[in-house]
Amino acid sequence: MELLGQKVKEDGVVIDEKILKVDGFLNHQIDAKLMNEVGRTFYEQFKDKGITKILTIEASGIAPAIMAALHFDVPCLFAKKAKPSTLTDGYYETSIHSFTKNKTSTVIVSKEFLSEEDTVLIIDDFLANGDASLGLYDIAQQANAKTAGIGIVVEKSFQNGHQRLEEAGLTVSSLCKVASLEGNKVTLVGEE
């Protein structure tokens, strides 16, 4: 997705050779028009897969996931990082390690909203080592739901997340693939 690639190159801030900050349009302030295009693109790629639900994790995955859900005309379900007192009827849970935050969290999804009748498209903002996507896939498996694929907004292709997801048998669609953050510069796949 060319527009997204331009935005990553122009507005992304390289923190170090493994961390890219995109707070200006994705992780803090959200460019709604760009996220609409992201959602539309995921719809075009997965529209024939019988998607019944978009699954993501709070918080940064919600914006692209909700836009995808609008295009699919299905609900968006996000895994919570804390169990609310209102969740009393059972839930699926898994542990997910955040590469950026270097923190492991237990995330949960209510059994009320995910079942074997669902075909989910997992959406996430970033793909580094693949832990978040694999954790969401684990939750879908616990529910006996089918996973149609994984939609990633920005993939750090120099890390092993894509490979890990494919080794798990998952279809991965990354809209922007970053080849390198070396030299304090964003280099996209195909520009090396």
From Swiss-Prot:
UniProt keyword annotation of Transferase present: yes
Subcellular location, principal: cytoplasm
GO molecular function: xanthine phosphoribosyltransferase activity
Reaction equations catalysed: XMP + diphosphate = xanthine + 5-phospho-alpha-D-ribose 1-diphosphate
Binding residues annotated for xanthine, in chain numbering: L20, N27, K156
HAMAP family: XPRTase
Subunit organization: Homodimer.
Protein name stated in the entry: Xanthine phosphoribosyltransferase
Organism field: Staphylococcus aureus (strain NCTC 8325 / PS 47)
Gene (name only): xpt
